[in-house]
Amino acid sequence: MESFFRARRTWMIGMVAGAALAVTGAAFAQAYPNKPIKFIITHAAGGLPDTVARIYAQRLSERLGQPVTVDNKPGANGMVAAQAMALAPKDGYTFMVTDGSTFSINPLISKSLSYDYKRDFVAVSLAARAPLYLAVHPKTPANNLRELIALAKAKPGGLTYGSSGIGSTHHLTMESLKASLGMEITHIPFKGTGQSVPALVGGQVDMLFSALPSLIGFVKSGQVRLLANNAAKRSTQEPNVPAIAEIIPGFDFAPIVAVFAASGTPAAAIERISTEMAAIAKMPEVVQTLSNAGIEAIGGSAAECHRAVLEEVDRLGKAVAQAGIQKE
């Protein structure tokens, strides 16, 4: 009999605690947000995550009635920002905006990673996707991807390509393309697109992958030529430029930009931000503004965001193996 009353007492305590948590959660959701929200950005001002974050932050602030600030913490391919995010208060007022490399590439190439995606973070929302474009210098005698493939196979190792750094999406996209088609093209890594794109324009390398905003001015001036993009389909920004997937079915390395929170962040905060981000992604002016920058708005739920990260981990893991990159 005593055990019966003990069990009943434990059950009642649990019920009371659960009810208290439910009330607390409901109160939080009703009041949220009641102070400024901060977006930690993994890259410097002007980069892809920064561009996307600022456009969304402005609309998010208008919809929530609270300031949404942007805090750039570039360095180590997003590791600096991710570490700061993992240590930030888990109160629903700090989020991180990053491209997929923070969680899909870094764990594959770094031995000293201090964070773990599944342990330390939770997906909130997809925000955008930005295809990279394969661009060549005008002196490169190839007017389309098939001609470039033929040229590379005729001159094994004779052509060069630049990238924004070893292990970058620019690097891994080309390595996957090379492996898929059996090409030998020499890699010349640079420290960011601020170095790699000028190297292409100056003829120091024959080709590279980069985002449209960093190339479009040189395309218009005739200093570089676009041959293909690395997304699953043609982009509305450059509909005459084919997707590599038209030659290699399933080829898709277009980087995503998404919002994440630290594990332990209130579910109500995550749900609210996710819902608002999805609504913002459908705003015509947001779609157009991003499109003008060569970026596609793609609102997506927390579950869709999480799935996209896992898909990138799988896809880029294969590319890292193909490139022979060892953890350092």
Residue ranges of model-derived segments:
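Hinge/capping helix and adjacent helix->loop/strand transition within the periplasmic-binding protein
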Residues: 87-93, 108-195, 244, 249, ...
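A ligand-binding cleft/hinge motif common to bilobed small-molecule-binding domains
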Residues: 103-112, 171, 178-180, 207-239
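N-terminal (or domain-start) structured segment
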Residues: 28-119, 158, 166, 182-209, ...
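Extracytoplasmic/secreted proteins, especially bacterial periplasmic and envelope-associated proteins
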Residues: 51, 55, 59, 80, ...
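N-terminal signal peptide c-region/cleavage motif recognized by signal peptidases
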Residues: 24-26
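An extracytoplasmic/periplasmic, membrane-proximal ligand-sensing/linker region
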Residues: 2, 34-36, 180-183, 220, ...
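N-terminal export leaders
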Residues: 8-12
